[in-house]
Design a protein with these regions (language model features):
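Exposed beta-strand and adjacent loop surfaces of beta-rich binding modules
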Residues: 120
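Anionic-ligand binding patches
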Residues: 123
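Active-site glycine-rich loop that binds ribose-phosphate moieties when present
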Residues: 127
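Extended, subdomain-level signal for the structured scaffold at the beginning of enzyme domains
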Residues: 1-98, 102, 111-117, 130-187
Length: 187
């Protein structure tokens, strides 16, 4: 398992869910990816729901989708802030349109909704935003991880191992089918 040469952005804003930011960030680094924390530009450091800080490497308006292989969006309450910034939505939309991985867990489904990329897709999320996902035109599946082409979604921190395995497999080029649904939860 090697992600050497892969460039991954992890989005951050205040009130991010601690595990949903740090677990994927560290797993991607462990697998060899170059990982950068990308913020909205409103601050240089953001604080998690439980008080843990993360320092950003750049603001979204300083990053080009062409320079990334994936964007990971942690949950918590940060997605409600992230979705308010046009530069964040543009980055997520462009990464998705370029056929690269967009991965969202828990409440992070709000960002792909606001970026307009969920319509016609299969997805999962934290149960509290299930109606939002459905109203955005997605088919909701209650599974630990759902991969539909280059879109990967997951529900809660309990699902982080499957979420990260699926992201890594997608970045390694396995089971990417932009026209169909893939469930890699068994990896």
């Amino acid at each position: 398992m090697s992600l050497e040469g892969k460039r991954v952005a992890v989005l951050a804003e205040d009130n991010y869910q601690d595990l949903e930011l740090w677990y994927p960030l560290l797993r991607m680094r462990e697998a060899g990816a170059q990982v950068k924390v990308i913020g909205t530009g409103s601050a240089e450091t953001y604080t998690s729901k439980y008080g843990y800080p993360v320092t950003v490497d750049a603001a979204a308006d300083e990053v080009k989708a062409a320079d990334l292989d994936a964007v990971i969006i942690p949950g918590g309450y940060a997605p409600d802030r992230l979705r308010r910034y046009p530069a964040i939505l543009k980055l997520v939309r462009e990464v998705f349109e370029q056929g690269k991985v967009v991965a969202a867990i828990c409440h992070a489904g709000w960002v792909p909704i606001s970026a307009g990329i969920l319509k016609g897709k299969k997805a999962t999320c934290f149960f509290a935003i299930k109606d939002d996902v459905i109203n955005a035109g997605a088919t909701y599946l209650d599974q630990e991880v759902v991969q539909d082409g280059n879109l990967i979604t997951s529900r809660t921190p309990d699902d982080l191992p499957a979420f990260c395995r699926t992201i890594i497999a997608a970045l390694e080029g396995y089971n990417i089918d932009p026209t169909g649904f893939q469930n890699l939860s068994g990896l």
